[in-house]
Swiss-Prot record:
It comes from Xanthomonas oryzae pv. oryzae (strain MAFF 311018). This is Peptide methionine sulfoxide reductase MsrA. PANTHER family: MITOCHONDRIAL PEPTIDE METHIONINE SULFOXIDE REDUCTASE. InterPro entries: Met_Sox_Rdtase_MsrA_dom (IPR002569), Met_Sox_Rdtase_MsrA_sf (IPR036509), MsrA_MetSO_reductase (IPR050162). It is an enzyme of class 1 (oxidoreductase). The active site is at 54. The keyword Oxidoreductase applies. Belongs to the MsrA Met sulfoxide reductase family. It comes from the Bacteria.
Length: 216
């Protein structure tokens, strides 16, 4: 039997992943900052999932962006349904910590969100982000439309040129379409840094400017 450490740098195969559960984790369905629902159909609004390390700091990056309707912390990209935080930390779910971003395309462009994403972390680090090591910290963009997917790929290529010029390696960000199921994290993780202002935030960008979304 493989130990937990075996999955810190490798995503488990479906047969290796924890089974999870059918029932979603309990969730207080109101955003602590803006009062909007965390879960819903969000008719007339766009959605995207971003993974950029620990979701506590990542979610705060996006709830501060004007035009973002709501945000939520969760797990995506793996095999285990309705995983718990401890299960995700084991590396045996395949999930990355992700932020669901629901936004009004008339108020903020997808390119602006992409720029926020790229500049808020180091997308060249593979299965870690700073001192946070494991598959749950991998960089990811999970798109809900073909147009988002094309824009995400184009932004990656544009940012790679800037990173290369600054001496960084290859971008390891996972970019996918269609977006996988987003499993909401436990209630305490939602808007965590608003509940715990002195809480941990390990996010750190490269300092390299992303050449998209400048006029958004």
């Amino acid at each position: 039997m493989l130990g937990i450490g075996a999955f810190k740098q490798r995503i488990p195969c479906p047969g290796e992943a924890l089974p999870g559960r059918e029932q979603a984790l309990p969730l207080h369905n109101t955003h602590l900052i803006n009062g909007h629902p965390l879960r819903g159909e969000f008719t007339g609004l766009a959605q995207v999932q971003f993974g950029l390390g620990c979701f506590w700091g990542a979610e705060r990056k996006f709830w501060k962006v004007p035009g973002v309707y709501t945000t939520a912390a969760g797990y995506a990209g793996g095999q285990t349904p309705n995983a718990t935080y401890s299960e995700v930390c084991s590396g045996q779910t395949g999930h990355t910590e992700a932020v669901l971003v629901v936004f009004d395309e008339q108020a903020v462009s997808f390119e602006h969100l992409l720029r926020t994403f790229w500049e808020s972390h180091d997308p060249t680090q593979g299965m870690q982000q700073g001192n946070d090591v494991g598959t749950q910290y991998r960089s990811a963009i999970y798109c809900t439309t073909q147009a988002q997917y094309a824009a995400a790929l184009a932004s990656r290529d544009a940012y790679q040129q800037q990173l290369t010029a600054a001496g960084y390696g290859a971008i390891t960000t996972e970019i996918g379409f269609p977006a996988p199921t987003f499993y909401y994290a436990e209630d305490d993780h939602q808007q965590y840094l608003a509940k715990h202002p002195n809480g941990y935030c390990g996010l750190g960008g490269t300092g390299v400017s992303c050449p998209i979304g400048l006029d958004a």
